[in-house]
């Protein structure tokens, strides 16, 4: 599986249009430990990987069985030779037109002190969150509150995307809930449970 992930990332970077900057989720082995990561790709290169910090270990989620927390990578940049890139938890990236963004993953937003808090203090204008948050009664509304409150607290844009219907199983249902918020206001949100590909902009 890990070899297939590496091959897929290398293929994606080669086939992706140069003008697109993409962030995708991937499990990565780093120095003998497995991390749940967001991988940044642009112009035929894998720019970096950001590991998830807060791992849920309750209810239906038991991530600590498989993954290590990225907290140990707070200030360290560690090379991933196969991908010719590195991993660093507190990385801030900058687009060609000067927009600075940071990344956190799913449960990081639910934490008492999300990584996005310090990322915004250090200059991130937009936070991207790659998530796999399942559907339960009223959970959509709870996510809306978390996202709007964090974007208000950090005075930044917040882009949240979750796993879609095709990633559901007999145990968990995912709706593909996606939200774009700015400084406390939700400015775009999808309906969820969409079966076709779509593009959401704001």
Predicted regions and their residues:
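Enzyme catalytic cores with a strong preference for nitrogen-chemistry domains
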Residues: 1-202
């Amino acid at each position: 599986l890990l070899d297939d992930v590496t091959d897929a990332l290398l293929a994606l970077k080669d086939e992706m249009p140069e003008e697109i900057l993409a962030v995708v989720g991937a499990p990565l082995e780093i120095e003998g430990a497995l991390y749940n990561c967001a991988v940044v790709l642009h112009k035929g290169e894998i720019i970096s990987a950001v590991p998830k910090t807060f791992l849920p270990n309750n209810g239906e989620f038991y991530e600590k069985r498989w993954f290590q927390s990225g907290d140990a990578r707070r200030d360290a940049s560690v090379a991933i030779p196969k991908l010719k890139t590195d991993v660093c938890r507190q990385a801030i990236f900058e687009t060609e037109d000067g927009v600075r963004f940071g990344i956190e993953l799913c449960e990081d937003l639910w934490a008492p002190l999300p990584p996005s808090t310090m990322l915004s203090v250090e200059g991130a204008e937009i936070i991207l969150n790659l998530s796999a948050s399942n559907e339960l009664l009223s959970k959509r509304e709870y996510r809306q509150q978390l996202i709007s409150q964090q974007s208000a607290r950090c005075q930044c844009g917040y882009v949240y995307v979750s796993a879609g219907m095709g990633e559901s199983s007999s145990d968990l249902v995912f709706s593909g809930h996606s939200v774009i918020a700015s400084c406390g206001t939700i400015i775009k949100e999808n309906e969820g449970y969409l079966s076709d590909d779509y593009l959401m902009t704001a």
